[in-house]
C-alpha cells in the first residue's frame, strides 16, 4: 500500500501531493487460506492553504484476520518548509486502535475449547501516535518514520497499560528516485527498509516503468518474506489513478496460498503539476 499511498507508513506524507488526495485500497492476503488477513484503507489528506506549509489528513483502516477485527482511526498534521531544491515535511499522527476478538467463533476438533479463557469477547481501545519526516524534489525522495510510538503490555487484571519500550518500535526508511530516459519513458526505483530490534530486518526492492505518464508497470521483491510482487497502475486522468498488485510467495507458503491481491484507487481534486510536484512519488 505504501507504494501508492505513503500516508500508510509516514505521517509526513500528508499534503505532499499538493492537492486534496483521496485514497481507497483493499488487500486480500494469502488467498485460499481460511481466516487470512483482509485489509481496507480510506484516507484523505491535503494542504490547507496556498503556501502549502500546513497539511491535514484523516485515515481509517479495517483489518480482519481469524476471529479478530481491528479498526484504526487517525488524524494527521504535517508542516513543510523549502529546503534546497525540494521540501522537507515533518508530520505527526494521533488516533485510536480498536480491536475485537470473538473467541466464540473459534472451532475446536472436539467442539470445546481446551482453555476456558478462550470464550467470549476481548475488546479494547488503545490510543497511539506516530512521527515522520519526508523530503522530496521532482527527482528523488527520502522518508523516515515511526508510525506507532506507544507500546502496551497487558497486566494481571487483563488491562492494557502503556509500557515504554523502544525496542518494540518499527522504524521505516524509504528512498527512491526518478530516472528520465525520454518524455514518454521513465524509471522509478525505490527501496523500503523496516527495522525492529526483535524482528528480522525487512527490505523491499521496488521498480516501476512509466510509459507516457499513463501506464505504470513494475515489480517488487520482499527479501524477508521471500515474495515477488507484480504491479500495474493506470493514470486514467490527471486526477484518477487505479492500481492492482499481486504478491507471489516464493517460500513454503506457496504450497498453501494462491497469492495476495490488492486493488487501489486514488482521486485528486484540483490537481496541478508544479516544479516540485511529487506526482511520481
Question: Where is each model-derived feature located?
Answer:
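Subset of outer-membrane beta-barrel
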Residues: 1-281
